[in-house]
Amino acid sequence: MDLVQKQKSLQDYTKSLFLEGILDSQFLQLQQLQDESNPDFVSQVVTLFFQDSDRILNDLSLSLDQQVVDFKKVDPHVHQLKGSSSSIGAQRVKNACVVFRSFCEQQNVEACHRCLQQVKQEYYLVKNRLETLFKLEQQIVASGGMIPAVELGF
């Protein structure tokens, strides 16, 4: 695949992430903060999000598996995950966290377990898709190209 095809492929792939609701405009704002002085800014921020999210999801699993669930511990974790996913534009993770928090407020253990599975599913989806996006970007840079701006236009 030549450079122009790689760039077009990246643009199409990125658009699909927005069309599927996986990412929202916050991700574009994050990309705008990246420049020549810090070319890995977005991938660094997203990597930190992945590390924090893995820890939070593990903590949530442990908390919900307790004999007596302490929702005063569960809710702050969900709130933190909602905030961090919102800050990188991981829209579907954020939306799943909103539902999760409502069940925390109701102290509905069964529904919280289902929500945790949904959050994990959305998280692993966005993680996989962003890792693919970054690989495409790396291939373009390795070929001597520039990362093209994405015009969503929808």
Curated annotation (Swiss-Prot):
<keyword id="KW-0932">Cytokinin signaling pathway</keyword>
<dbReference type="InterPro" id="IPR008207">
    <property type="entry name" value="Sig_transdc_His_kin_Hpt_dom"/>
</dbReference>
<feature type="domain" description="HPt">
    <location>
        <begin position="38"/>
        <end position="143"/>
    </location>
</feature>
<dbReference type="GO" id="GO:0043424">
    <property type="term" value="F:protein histidine kinase binding"/>
</dbReference>
<dbReference type="GO" id="GO:0005737">
    <property type="term" value="C:cytoplasm"/>
</dbReference>
<comment type="subunit">
    <text>Interacts with the B-type response regulators ARR1, ARR2, ARR4 and ARR9. Binds to ETR1, AHK2, AHK3, AHK4, AHK5 and FBR12.</text>
</comment>
<keyword id="KW-0007">Acetylation</keyword>
<dbReference type="GO" id="GO:0000160">
    <property type="term" value="P:phosphorelay signal transduction system"/>
</dbReference>
<dbReference type="InterPro" id="IPR036641">
    <property type="entry name" value="HPT_dom_sf"/>
</dbReference>
<feature type="modified residue" description="N-acetylmethionine">
    <location>
        <position position="1"/>
    </location>
</feature>
<feature type="modified residue" description="Phosphohistidine">
    <location>
        <position position="79"/>
    </location>
</feature>
<dbReference type="GO" id="GO:0009553">
    <property type="term" value="P:embryo sac development"/>
</dbReference>
<dbReference type="GO" id="GO:0009736">
    <property type="term" value="P:cytokinin-activated signaling pathway"/>
</dbReference>
<keyword id="KW-0597">Phosphoprotein</keyword>
<keyword id="KW-0963">Cytoplasm</keyword>
<dbReference type="GO" id="GO:0009825">
    <property type="term" value="P:multidimensional cell growth"/>
</dbReference>
<protein>
    <recommendedName>
        <fullName>Histidine-containing phosphotransfer protein 1</fullName>
    </recommendedName>
</protein>
<keyword id="KW-0346">Stress response</keyword>
<dbReference type="InterPro" id="IPR045871">
    <property type="entry name" value="AHP1-5/YPD1"/>
</dbReference>
<dbReference type="Pfam" id="PF01627">
    <property type="entry name" value="Hpt"/>
</dbReference>
<dbReference type="GO" id="GO:0009927">
    <property type="term" value="F:histidine phosphotransfer kinase activity"/>
</dbReference>
<comment type="function">
    <text>Functions as a two-component phosphorelay mediators between cytokinin sensor histidine kinases and response regulator (B-type ARRs). Plays an important role in propagating cytokinin signal transduction through the multistep His-to-Asp phosphorelay.</text>
</comment>
<dbReference type="GO" id="GO:0005829">
    <property type="term" value="C:cytosol"/>
</dbReference>
<keyword id="KW-0539">Nucleus</keyword>
<keyword id="KW-0902">Two-component regulatory system</keyword>
<dbReference type="GO" id="GO:0005634">
    <property type="term" value="C:nucleus"/>
</dbReference>
